[in-house]
Amino acid sequence: MLGVCYYPEHWPEERWEEDFKAMRALGLRYVRLGEFAWSALEPTPGALRWGWLDRVLDLAQKEGLAVVLGTPTATPPKWLVDRYPEILPVDREGRRRNFGGRRHYCFSSPAYREETARIVALLAERYGRHPAVVGFQVDNEFGCHGTVRCYCPNCREAFRGWLRAKYGTIDALNAAWGTVFWSQTYRDFGEVELPHLTVAEANPSHLLDYYRFASDQVRAYNRFQVDLLRDNAPGRFITHNFMGFFTDLDPFALAEDLDFAAWDSYPLGFTDLMPLPQEEKVQWARTGHPDVAAFHHDLYRGVGRGRFWVMEQQPGPVNWAPHNPSPAPGMVRLWTWEAIAHGAEVVSYFRWRQAPFAQEQMQAGFNRPDFQPEVAFFEVQRVAEELSALPLPPAGCAPVALVYDSEAAWVFEIQPQGAEWKYLTLVFSFYSVFRRLGLEVDIFKPGAELGGYGLVVVPSLPIVRKEALEALSQADGLVIVGPRSGSKTEKFQIPPEIPPGALQALLPLKVVRVESLPPGLLEEAEGPWGRFAFGVWREWVETDLPPLLRFTDGGGILFRRGRYLYLAAWPSPELLFALCQSLAEEAGLHPRFLPEGLRLRRRGPLVFAFNYGPEVVEAPAPPGVRFLLGDRRIPPHDLAVWEET
Amino acid sequence: MLGVCYYPEHWPEERWEEDFKAMRALGLRYVRLGEFAWSALEPTPGALRWGWLDRVLDLAQKEGLAVVLGTPTATPPKWLVDRYPEILPVDREGRRRNFGGRRHYCFSSPAYREETARIVALLAERYGRHPAVVGFQVDNEFGCHGTVRCYCPNCREAFRGWLRAKYGTIDALNAAWGTVFWSQTYRDFGEVELPHLTVAEANPSHLLDYYRFASDQVRAYNRFQVDLLRDNAPGRFITHNFMGFFTDLDPFALAEDLDFAAWDSYPLGFTDLMPLPQEEKVQWARTGHPDVAAFHHDLYRGVGRGRFWVMEQQPGPVNWAPHNPSPAPGMVRLWTWEAIAHGAEVVSYFRWRQAPFAQEQMQAGFNRPDFQPEVAFFEVQRVAEELSALPLPPAGCAPVALVYDSEAAWVFEIQPQGAEWKYLTLVFSFYSVFRRLGLEVDIFKPGAELGGYGLVVVPSLPIVRKEALEALSQADGLVIVGPRSGSKTEKFQIPPEIPPGALQALLPLKVVRVESLPPGLLEEAEGPWGRFAFGVWREWVETDLPPLLRFTDGGGILFRRGRYLYLAAWPSPELLFALCQSLAEEAGLHPRFLPEGLRLRRRGPLVFAFNYGPEVVEAPAPPGVRFLLGDRRIPPHDLAVWEET
Amino acid sequence: MLGVCYYPEHWPEERWEEDFKAMRALGLRYVRLGEFAWSALEPTPGALRWGWLDRVLDLAQKEGLAVVLGTPTATPPKWLVDRYPEILPVDREGRRRNFGGRRHYCFSSPAYREETARIVALLAERYGRHPAVVGFQVDNEFGCHGTVRCYCPNCREAFRGWLRAKYGTIDALNAAWGTVFWSQTYRDFGEVELPHLTVAEANPSHLLDYYRFASDQVRAYNRFQVDLLRDNAPGRFITHNFMGFFTDLDPFALAEDLDFAAWDSYPLGFTDLMPLPQEEKVQWARTGHPDVAAFHHDLYRGVGRGRFWVMEQQPGPVNWAPHNPSPAPGMVRLWTWEAIAHGAEVVSYFRWRQAPFAQEQMQAGFNRPDFQPEVAFFEVQRVAEELSALPLPPAGCAPVALVYDSEAAWVFEIQPQGAEWKYLTLVFSFYSVFRRLGLEVDIFKPGAELGGYGLVVVPSLPIVRKEALEALSQADGLVIVGPRSGSKTEKFQIPPEIPPGALQALLPLKVVRVESLPPGLLEEAEGPWGRFAFGVWREWVETDLPPLLRFTDGGGILFRRGRYLYLAAWPSPELLFALCQSLAEEAGLHPRFLPEGLRLRRRGPLVFAFNYGPEVVEAPAPPGVRFLLGDRRIPPHDLAVWEET
Ligand SMILES: [Zn+2]
Ligand SMILES: [Zn+2]
Ligand SMILES: [Zn+2]
């Protein structure tokens, strides 16, 4: 199903009906609205103006549109900030962050909790049973603009409380953090500060607990809104729109309080911002890197326990990346189908019409500011027609499971130990390899059941909790575990049995030394799949297991016991490809070697093939299959769908 | 005429007479002094020490030197700052900027207005009728060190007042800024903050109004001094020394209150700092880029309504650029003649003698700290002799007019939309092409009359006010309008008729989509002048006009109706050259193709040819002309002057 | 002799005896401890817990280990900071720096002086006569994390007092700083601020005095502790562990109050951080640049007036550089011998066992966190055995003396005048050339006697005080003086006789102009040793001396009178090599041309040869010598020692 984001408060009332009719005519079913409308609803404290929203919802109902109503808490009005200036967040540099953009509130502020309670309860009471309203979006893009972590006095108080609840006694905290180091022993929770502007680097356990706390605060704030909504909106779903390449927040935890996950998909903006070589940024500037959207579809499908929406889909140039190219013709359609192939229940575009004013005036929509349709309009028209003709079977499980961990991102952010070590880069490089191999991936948090997967990939899991170890133990496929896994305890200490810590139960080896390498320093390795040059990270392993791959100085780089493998280095793309291909073959997953711009995705018996490249490619379909969309010859930026049984 | 900057307060009194005699002997007529002398004049509050300056001026008078007296407000003394700490400016990061350098005051400070009134009135009363004093310089280099924009409480108050005066009602402001976006609706002007340290980017209309306000505050402060001076200094001119490559301030507006403009010309420092490829920085390290000084001469001649001085001319290495090379021998003479050829009424060098102490001790002067003459001394001696032998006809109009707009710089600073889009880079690349074509350029603000110019160039003019449109309509030459022109209303909104907005009256086309491109992503275009590869910026145009140049995907890049042309992309230097050459030929301007280091400038019937390059070049003079300086063979870093009729 | 750093407070008491026994078994004699143990000693204010340290020291005594006891002032406990929050330092940005790392105190804080007096006196009283305690280390790495320079109110007060003591009258200060420039004349010392956050750059004399003050404050604080210790610890030495490539602090001055110097040697970390081309960083990533440790050995031997220790020697990967590679096998042994060859009295490793917790958990030690020995353990075992078999003669004087000046580093930090001008880079490039020439270097502060050295090198000495001039006058070898020497007075002014100022007594020439060059702008020079291309810096010299080397435009680059030479440019490595080789030959020092990775060091009749390279090299030993370690064929990362008479 398709939807769109709409801001009735931006347009004259006489245009609403016409817009809603045009949405329906285009084939849209959902409309999201309201998420930045606080000052339109409450222009002065307590004087609620419901009228316009009443009329919008009635009109939507009349036109057959289902409304997702956003709570407006991402943008507290100026009067609220002036009344409670302490709700403004404080950045890592200790500077109060001002009103004038959005997300100008601290998750720990008691005053903001009260104001949130007031506006959300009012909203839910008034519209929770409105027939047009099918669900709610809580707030908008939690954490955007670096807002998960705040350094204000309210956060300091809340952090101290969080620590007290976690540790019980200050001695337990001292032991966990190793505060005996550098004389940091605390006598009371009230002595603990927020870890910023320290003279030397802060204690890593202190930082990790603070990052956990900050993520927890967002979750608690979301939960606070969810509870208010549930009370007043029977039968309505509640979701939130997560972001791409964003790790400050643990989406798996937060989504436990949601009905499903949603995310905002801007493939071109992400491609310009992600750490790719410049030539790849240029190569994919108009299509987005072929795995960027797919990765997040899989991630948020996991986060949503199988259910997800794309709440904001890029329909044209955006305004917030360093460079904002125009999508190649066909890409909006392709991205939509990629989302659907991955199981998206709804793809909702951002936005119905480009606003001619304010911060996002350069972000394109379905319609231009002069009310004429944009390119994307016609591409979506086509998707809507195609969709109505194509019955979608439910998506099954993927052959590959990937374990993704927000906490891992925090651990390595705190302690990279090598400037090039980036958690998301490692995860994405594993993910990309499977896409090139034509293999679908399901993404799980640590501890999720992994049974039934032919191949389980753990790019890196520094902290291995009991449930994660159990899940890995019970996996019945091949399990490949990446470097630095098991290298820390939950307290951010080196485990007593040294790395990989608890994983030694599965992989009897010890990592006795690690090193990070400067750019240009490559180690050569050799094995059954050829020779590979490695950089970034290397580990020394003591074990009785014979290495499957060795550095030329003799050190092992890949070890295996039974179905468990351990990779003791940052893998080069070439090694990763050879290794994953080999394991996939062993697991009977029938990997392919797809052309550079081609990607596949199955949904039940349907196979979707997407051509992100600039040349025609042949669909890797068995002879004689029936094509439901397109045909064997896939033009650039186009797709084909066929049925395999 | 020639002059020099002198700091009598830096030297023992017994040296003054000798210095003044030496200046006259060198052929100098003007001496600027006093602009940093506040604490020498008023070492403690209210205790004025006029004696030394009395003696300096009498001596100057005796020696036949005409004095330009600076008001000393760029450097309030420490006692003043201690008495009124609130005059210290606050930077964008919210930090109070301290005493210890210069320009440590806020233009909005009421206390500083009072202190300014006091010292300037005293100065004007005492010296406004002194026979040696021929004019005043207000303050020094307004805006230097990022001081146009201040974020202090006084500025906040003043900004609120400025908005109230502009908009009248807060509803008008809300509508203009589109504050309905992100719930930023204000109820009162007292709610509006300065746009900094916001969590997400601030509203662009808010930013633009703040930048306008900040520029206005400087103008008002200058006007405040001008009024004080006019009252007490009959017949004396008033000017200000503007800076190079500086856009925070609108010089056209400020100069309306001056008798003429002046600027400070440091070709080597600017060349090291401007955004050139490193190889060009090296190429021009000892000469300055050949168009840097010329561009500013033309700009400030326009700002000065035809009249300008060079108030500070670089005579040797400076101290403030990342690299400070020595000018090639001959360059001080060449720069001087370039200024004169552009119509400079006076070229005044900075400074008479290198100070052995304090911040600028590494900045060379005419004399070394040991009182010996520097290289520049002898070059200027030669210029003075040459000048006295060469009668200078008045300068006429140039064949090309270029429209320059400070507001355009602000718009693109606020909303580059592509990291490489820089207003000055675009303007300078147009300007440089005409210099290479041997064509003089006059520079105007938008709205100035453009009649009589064979070619009018508008590199980019995002906000097209009524008077600018009228002036363009009444131009009688060819008019080339660059990308993003007409793309914003005065309110910083997309115009209702979409870009190029009001320009559609002249150019019936619509820009329906724009994009910025990452470095390395080039689009190919083809047309009558060849094939060109473009990056940075592209626009999609809907129009019935046939394109003169097309991208290889068919999109038009250059459109024309009658004498108006629209360029829908960031031009490559190659295209710009071909296009401007072709238009100049059509306009009958007889463009040439000058060698890389050669530049021409006419002043009446005189043609000046400047050789910035390291090789001898031949002067492009018709056969048989009379050479007034040099001859047909121009050595490196030298010049020739001949008469054409 | 060998030692190790140990943190008993990090380990269970039952392990101490076992650890001490293992240290002795390994051949270690010294153990440093206690320097971060304040909160272990005084967990709450006034409640001292001596018991554990009593037992540690008694145990050390019993096991035959000599203890170096650190004063714990680098890490004041949280309760102390909470009681006196004003001890926290303030950074250049004006931000209070928080508790949570280490070195969170201001050297000017009266409260911290009191607390220091209390804890150091208690410690000295209790342990100053303990038989295990042979000496004290004051604090730890003074200045680490940018803590020499603080911008707090206490420092402002102290700086004003320091200025008053230095100048006596404010007029003297005004004259010295040239405050007449930019109206900065002060009426009272109480008007002077700390030089930061100024609108334009601060006055250089102001900055230099502040940098001197800041260095003096550290020295005074150290002296304060030394006095407390001397009173209570008869016969115990007092030292401090200095850092590498660190210039904020003048180590020569501070060490006047110590018995000898110590320093912390981390060759790999320094190599990753120093300004080397990336390819050299890669080349030496696992060995350290071959001259990094040697340079500091020579520097701190000079600082220690002939006596120094390595207090912390890197034994494996560290955690604080951008990249932290593993040392090549053999390097820990090689580094140890390099230190000993340079005269180190003790080499003490950091640390006995890798801590599994807190900030330095990724820094390797002799033992892993699981109590197993690391690679370094076995290398040191070998060194200990070799040491006991090799009688070490005293080290003699080197043939080359190098003059090193912290103040020079400050002058050029304040006024680089060219972005690439870095004092340490210049010094290190001179030093490296002599290492390649097989010539030892002694390092002195300006003013030290230089008699007996065949060659004296002054890379750059901007401020030449009377005693420095005298020492150079009395040198009896060749003296090469580098660019910008003599270019400033003690007041940070250009000397009246212009540069090289007082050095004109030795070198009758005047530097009449200087310039810095952008990268890529090279000047060609030619002379007896060939042609060389130069960048970065060039000077113009007026003199009757004929140049030994000329730029191709005729300007001289190298001048000589008698045994004094002046170099008027930033030297290229090629020129430096040719020049130093030639001078060394003239001086009869018998320079060699060593292979790239080979280095020599004499200690009495012993010659040590170190192979930092990856290939076997031949020892440059005369035929027939006796090898005491290794032999003529030196494997990679190995050494040889032979006797020459
Ligand atoms: Zn907060
Ligand atoms: Zn202000
Ligand atoms: Zn301080």
From Swiss-Prot, chains A, B, C:
Record field: temperature dependence: Optimum temperature is 70 degrees Celsius with ONPG as substrate. Stable for several months at 4 or -20 degrees Celsius in the presence of 10% glycerol. Activity increases continuously from 30 to 90 degrees Celsius and drops dramatically at higher temperatures. Retains 50% of its initial activity after 1 hour incubation at 70 degrees Celsius. Retains 90% and 50% of activity after 30 minutes of incubation at 70 and 80 degrees Celsius, respectively. The residual activity of the enzyme decreases to an undetectable level after heating for 30 minutes at 90 degrees Celsius.
Q: State the Pfam families in the record.
A: Glyco_hydro_42 (PF02449), Glyco_hydro_42C (PF08533), Glyco_hydro_42M (PF08532)
In its UniProt record, which GO terms are filed under biological process? Answer: galactose metabolic process
Gene Ontology cellular component annotations, sorted alphabetically? beta-galactosidase complex
Q: Which residues bind substrate?
A: R102, N140, W320, E360, Q361, M362, Q363
Query: Per UniProt, what is the name of the gene that codes for the protein in this document?
Result: bgaA
What is this protein's record name? Beta-galactosidase BgaA
Q: Tell me yes or no: is Zinc among this UniProt entry's keywords.
A: yes
Q: Which GO terms describe its molecular function?
A: beta-galactosidase activity; metal ion binding
Keyword terms = Glycosidase, Hydrolase, Metal-binding, Zinc
InterPro entries in alphabetical order: Beta_galactosidase_C, Beta_galactosidase_Trimer, Class_I_gatase-like, Glyco_hydro_42, Glyco_hydro_42_N, Glyco_hydro_b, Glycoside_hydrolase_SF
Domain of life of the organism in this record?
A: Bacteria
Family of this protein: Belongs to the glycosyl hydrolase 42 family.
Q: Which residues form the active site?
A: E141 (proton donor), E312 (nucleophile)
Known function: Hydrolyzes chromogen 5-bromo-4-chloro-3-indolyl-beta-D-galactopyranoside (X-gal), o-nitrophenyl-beta-D-galactopyranoside (ONPG) and lactose.
Organism expressing this protein natively: Thermus sp
